[in-house]
UniProtKB/Swiss-Prot annotation:
The protein's name in its UniProt record: Alanine--tRNA ligase
Cofactor dependence: Zn(2+)
Organism: Rickettsia canadensis (strain McKiel)
Residues engaged in binding Zn(2+): 567, 571, 669, 673
Domain of life (superkingdom): Bacteria
Entry remark concerning the domains of this protein: Consists of three domains; the N-terminal catalytic domain, the editing domain and the C-terminal C-Ala domain. The editing domain removes incorrectly charged amino acids, while the C-Ala domain, along with tRNA(Ala), serves as a bridge to cooperatively bring together the editing and aminoacylation centers thus stimulating deacylation of misacylated tRNAs.
E.C. number(s) listed in UniProt: 6.1.1.7
Gene symbol of the encoding locus: alaS
Enzyme class at the top of the EC tree: ligase
A cellular-component GO term for this protein: cytosol
Lineage: Bacteria, Pseudomonadati, Pseudomonadota, Alphaproteobacteria, Rickettsiales
Length: 878
């Protein structure tokens, strides 16, 4: 049996099916598109789900893929097992061949058998197959093609060998191929009590989609029968490299060897498992980030964080004091970047996210491990850690439950899952009660009732600025009313149709006016509820307004135009960010206001001044080109095929609105836009900042607001010139001279303060108070910088061997504490401990420093009169 590399196995599989007229389809993102039932793509068939159900047509009827997949929980895939067993992974590659109404059972079995025995040269006597117990057709084909007898064809009655997409829809029997690793490895054949052992390993699974489940009692033959085949790349490679553990294949070994060279710990004993965890989780983390997932505390982001923090804990176990994962990324890119180019494109971004997350977690990891160690001191083998402590580790120290379980597994200690769930539910209940008490619950139910009775609001604003509409709902103080007649009353109004845009997609809602027969209403905002109810937030200016009457709805055209300008600019900005910062940049949020725009992106470092200038230049160049802006309604599938930008994880209707701006931007968008890009006028970035880990925010203005901004800056410059009695050509020189002079004055002032605080040995002996055999100098000072205090306190403790100096400085409503201790007595009196106790007494959170010099903070000025008493009791105890 020839030995193949991982890359050769993948390539040979794809080439084999391409030779047999299958279209090679690239791997889809790990984030399922328009499939809310899945968090991640977990098999090769996911991207073809709509093809199998007949909802989508492709230009081919046979396909082959190498699909990146991810599983981080569920049956046989608990995260805590990854790295400790031979075949558990979070990230893996699923090789697959598919038929959509072309070949079926016999040809699928032939392809699989020929691939394994001819192309991969597996010995026939090492192979067994399973079929669904009633699938005589599959049994006959296995006998015909492989020459197997009944002893090698195992009939399985359970659902393991019958696949379905859900309660209804396509379904069918399966046939699996198993490889025998030999008698020296524990395990039994499928269907036996020892089937979970490692001897007989499933290497290929074929699903014969031949039925449609109409309801729970009715199953009919499908007119178009299909094939879904999956083969795990890592499992197959292990067999072809003559090893029984997936982590021993070349791909993982190269990552492990690379890691070993960095951490300098031998791959043996318990360390071996940590190396495997890191290798597996490096792949999962890197591919998730490449596909737009950012570590967070919910949804996909939390799964990523769980995986990353588990790997970081294992890096910690190997003695890695510095961030490790990002240092391993170049090796992964070298190994997998050619087949998955998104890794290469996003390498810098992935590296930054990995490093930042590890730095952040290291600050709480040590404290969390300390708490866990303290809480398990009295626990022995077989005991349970309380759910309360597990939840505290999760809530306070950022330990996912998987991580706590993973740590305790080494000591045969489990976690009280029920107690953890109760703590989690209690927290949610507290939040729920807060929500119920806020009045939001009642309002929420109201919108559901309105939608059920009246349906959606028709939006007319793409083409009309005013229209006659019928008032169908009036709401005041969360209650339905028939009329509003008190002037200056605030209320909500819903009509059957409206030209007013309800806030959504980042664009703020419209303002304007409503005129009815006897009334005038000011619309101060427009909202959107449940995705399709447009709600006008109103103030009655005069008259009386009734449910059922018609009225003239007129938007503020100038306000809308400014919204259009800034919204269209966000699309151009998005396209340019891809060009300047990289394709891996994804939109994380936006706000389109009439006076500015805000755009949040996944990007792990500050955008440089040079990049900001380049972005501005490119956006303005596109604006000046004055391309036409076109909007089209089309099927979501067609829009995505044309390259329209869509947000990852968003669920879109079957028909979407596509906004095209020349050849520069194509996005799915329901907002309002300019007719030509020249209408934007000009574009200027006003601010760039970090708002969360891996998320940057860009703020900008357009059109007349750029001119306003420039005028404000020009007026400010003139004001500064006037105050400093200079001109703009000499302004920088003048300011630098002033700064230099101020620096000199500050140094002189520091010297004066130090001289004032300095004491001779005789003065120290005279002024110091003696407590428990040591001298204490305590002083409260107003408005003095900490640098001077540190130096002054340290100078005094160097003069006398038994001195403690405590300075407290009041600056506004904050207190700064400086504690210095003569080095000769630090074994008994520790400056850090004294500073910490004083800080806690004054409402602070503790301090830091060294045994001889420490600083801390506080804010409870009312306790200053008791500080001397606190110091006395503290030093007496010490």
């Amino acid at each position: 049996m020839t030995k193949f590399t991982t890359e050769e196995v993948r390539s040979k599989f794809i080439t084999y099916f391409k030779t047999n007229n299958h279209t090679h389809v690239p791997a889809s993102s790990l984030i399922p598109q328009n499939d809310p039932s899945l968090m991640f793509v977990n098999s090769g068939m996911v991207q073809f789900k709509n093809v199998f159900t007949g909802q989508e047509k492709r230009p081919y009827n046979k396909a082959v893929t190498s699909q990146k997949s991810l599983r981080a929980g569920g049956k046989h895939n608990d995260l805590e097992n990854v790295g400790y067993t031979a075949r558990h992974h979070t990230f893996f590659e699923m090789l697959g061949n598919f038929s959509f109404g072309d070949y079926f059972k016999e040809q699928a079995i032939y392809y699989a058998w020929n691939l394994l025995t001819k192309k991969f040269e597996l010995p026939k006597n090492k192979l067994y197959v399973t079929i669904y117990h009633t699938d005589d057709e599959a049994a006959s084909y296995w006998k015909k093609i492989a020459g197997f007898g009944d002893d090698r064809i195992i009939r399985i009655k359970t659902n393991d060998n019958f696949w379905s997409m859900g309660d209804t829809g396509p379904c069918g029997p399966c046939s699996e191929i198993f490889y025998d690793h030999g008698e020296n490895i524990y395990g039994g054949l499928p269907g036996t009590k020892d089937e979970d052992g490692d001897r007989f390993i499933e290497i290929l699974n074929m699903v014969f989609m031949q039925y449609e489940q109409v309801d729970k009692d009715t199953r009919i033959e499908l007119p178009q029968k299909s094939i879904d085949t999956g083969m795990g790349l890592e499992r197959m490679t292990a067999i072809l490299q003559h090893v029984n553990n997936n982590y021993d294949i070349d791909l993982f070994q190269k990552i492990i060897d690379y890691t070993e060279n960095i951490v300098k710990v031998k791959v043996k004993g318990e360390a071996k498992f940590s190396y495997r965890v890191i290798a597996d989780h490096l792949r999962a983390s890197s591919f998730l980030i490449a596909d737009g997932v950012i570590p967070s505390n919910e949804g996909r982001g939390y799964v990523l964080r769980r995986i990353m923090r588990r790997s970081m804990r294992h890096a910690h176990m190997l003695g890695s004091k510095e961030p490790l994962m990002y240092k391993l990324l170049p090796k992964l890119v070298d190994l997998m970047g050619n087949i998955y180019p998104e890794l290469k494109r996003s390498e810098s971004f992935i590296s930054n996210i990995l490093e930042q997350e590890e730095i952040r977690f290291k600050t709480t990891l040590e404290r969390g491990l300390k708490l866990l160690s303290e809480e398990t001191e009295t626990l022995t083998k077989g005991d349970k850690l309380s759910g309360e402590i597990a939840f505290k580790l999760y809530d306070t120290y950022g330990f996912p439950l998987d991580l706590t379980k993973d740590i305790l597994k080494n000591y045969d200690i489990s976690v009280d899952h029920q107690g953890f769930k109760e703590q989690m539910l209690a927290q949610k209940e507290r939040a729920r009660k807060s929500w119920l008490g806020s009045g939001e619950y009642k309002t929420n139910q109201l919108w559901f009732d309105i939608k059920e009775q009246y349906g959606s609001t028709e939006f007319l604003g793409y083409t009309l600025n005013e229209a006659e509409c019928k008032i169908i709902v009036l709401i005041k103080d969360n209650n339905l009313v028939n009329n509003i007649q008190e002037t200056d009353t605030q209320f909500l109004l819903i009509s059957n149709q409206t030209p007013f845009y309800g806030e959504s997609g980042g664009q703020m809602g419209d303002n304007g006016t409503i005129f009815a027969k006897d009334s005038e209403v000011e619309v101060i905002d427009t909202l959107k509820y449940l995705g399709s109810i447009i709600v006008h937030k109103c103030i009655l200016k005069k008259g009386k307004i009734h449910v059922g009457e018609n009225a003239n709805f007129s938007i503020d055209v100038k306000y809308r135009q400014n919204l259009r300008i800034h919204h269209s600019a966000t699309h151009i900005l998005h396209a340019v960010l891809h060009e300047v910062l990289g394709k891996h940049v994804t939109q994380k949020g936006s706000l389109v206001a009439p006076t500015y725009l805000r755009f949040d992106i996944s990007y792990s470092k500050a955008v440089t001044n040079e990049e900001i200038t380049l972005i501005e230049d490119k956006v303005n160049e596109i604006i000046r080109a004055n391309h036409e802006v076109n909007t089209t309604l089309m099927a979501t599938e067609d829009a995505v095929k044309q390259g329209a930008m869509a947000l990852f994880g968003e669920k879109y209707d079957s028909e979407v609105r596509v906004v095209k701006m020349g050849n520069n931007s194509l996005e799915l968008c329901g907002g309002t836009h300019v007719r030509r890009l020249g209408d934007i006028g000009c574009f200027k970035i006003t601010n760039e900042s970090a708002i969360a880990a891996g998320i940057r925010r860009i703020e900008a203005v357009c059109g007349e607001f750029v001119i306003k901004l420039m005028r404000e800056k020009e007026n400010l410059l003139k004001s500064v010139e006037s105050s400093l009695k200079t001109n703009k050509n000499e302004l920088i020189t003048k300011v630098n001279n002033i700064l230099e002079r101020n620096k000199g004055l500050e140094k002189e002032l520091e010297k004066v303060h130090l001289a004032h605080l300095d004491l001779s040995i005789d003065q120290i002996n005279k002024e110091a108070e003696e407590i428990k055999g040591v001298k204490l100098i305590y002083q409260y000072i107003e408005n003095l910088n900490n640098k001077v205090l540190r130096q002054a306190a340290e100078n005094l403790t160097k003069k006398v061997e038994d001195l403690i100096v405590v300075y407290i400085v009041g600056n506004s409503d904050k207190l700064s504490i400086t504690v210095a201790v003569s080095k000769a007595i630090t074994d008994k009196f520790n400056a850090v401990n004294i500073a910490k106790e004083l800080s806690l007494f004054l409402g602070g959170t503790g301090g830091g420093g060294q045994a001889s010099l420490a600083q801390a903070g506080g804010h409870d000025i009312g306790k200053l009169n008791k500080i001397h008493e606190k110091l006395y009791s503290l030093l007496t105890v010490l």
